[in-house]
């Protein structure tokens, strides 16, 4: 049996008051590619449409739980199921909202917080390029490092967990964030033992304002949160987020190589402040967009 033949596309029409309950049912039963559509008119009063994909067995479980809500009874909506390989994406066709629902954000964040070999390899490569760029004062190399670094997901994953009130998701995001920062520090530390002096680190720190760096971090976080919640590509904004994590982490690795406690302390403070403010900014941006989505659904 082909993979596509085991997948089911589901179109669920329900009253708005059941949205949160249905979201929990879909989340529990591994549904994905979820979209929430608010049409001008449905077959039931004050109805919304939820579309998603699920494995055939999971789809059956979802239907059984929806029946307990009264789905199929008069005024309580309906569910349509068909093979997923003959359907199209409502979002791609412009039918669905361009903003992600809280449930869509949840599944997006679940992917973001995963620690994979590809992520670790990219962080290592970006760190090596980044420290070379700092040592040689090479701006293009630094920009290349920030484009490679997949650090935006580490920040936004934990921020989404905070907005959705999902403690486990937040913890997973923070673990990935700290792990990636640690990898950057180690990758910067090793070559810095041979090529970096205290004067070089002091030069960069003298050119860095903690206050201005903090402002950049919080703006980058807000922009990233709003872009992700809007369902838009966020790679360009991700470069700004990478600036706020990658460079401070690289500087800390370089400071560690000098064994100067003052430099280590300053770079640690810079990195810690940026990480916290990126998460705060991400929370603000996401909360703003998610709040607007919930307001639309409510009214």
UniProtKB/Swiss-Prot annotation:
What is any one of the record's Gene Ontology cellular component terms?
Answer: plasma membrane
Q: Which InterPro entries match?
A: DUF389
Q: Where in the cell is it found?
A: Cell membrane
Query: What membrane topology term does the record carry?
Result: Multi-pass membrane protein
Q: Does the keyword field hold Membrane?
A: yes
Q: List residues traversing the bilayer.
A: 128-148, 177-197, 210-230, 236-256, 261-281
Keywords attached to this Swiss-Prot or TrEMBL record, sorted alphabetically, are: Cell membrane, Membrane, Transmembrane, Transmembrane helix
User: Does Hydrolase show up as a keyword for this record?
Assistant: no
Describe the family membership recorded for this protein in Swiss-Prot or TrEMBL.
To M.jannaschii MJ0678.
Q: Could you tell me what this protein is called? A: Uncharacterized protein MJ1221
